[in-house]
Amino acid sequence: LMEGAKAKDVEDFLKSAIKGTEWENKVFAVGGFVRDEIMGKTPKDIDVVVDKIQGGIEFTIWLAKKVGTYKEGSNPTIFPTFGTAKMVLDGVVHNGVDLSGEDLEAVMPRSEQYHDSSSRKPTDIQFTDLEGDAKRRDLTINAIYKNVSTGEIVDPVGGMEDIKNKVVRPPSDPDLIYTDDALRMFRVIRFANRFGWELTP
């Protein structure tokens, strides 16, 4: 996990790394990073959605090669089922800040189906757009996207409004989301308690 300013440094590093490349305007910060920023807190770590089929995987491989830290099979670590990859930023220095010890998780926008109610593993994963991706997330406030290249906010399920009104709610049918994943239920309650916000079914 990243501390304070480092997450912003990673965002800045990403912005300059993708400038003028095929990845420009395809990389979006999401989740806690965007939520904390909007709430005026210092983001702790950064996760990104890369808007392309297998984008998370292709992007981190490209990035690791670009900065010279690519190691087949270990950096990035790849989770092919989910179209997800995790890259460590050891040895990367950006604007005089050493990003060693930070990591970057990148995913493609995806929709998920859980057919086996006893399992937390989705069985059917499809590439989708940001709106589809937002709907699979646990809370609207964690489903706000920030274009790393432009800073533009994409808010498909009304997360900004919910932050303003201090409301914690799921982005789509709660039964669907929480049947999918009971652990999420606990996260939601934890969030509501942490911020002292209202829980909306």
Predicted regions and their residues:
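Catalytic cores of the polymerase beta-like nucleotidyltransferase superfamily
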Residues: 1-201
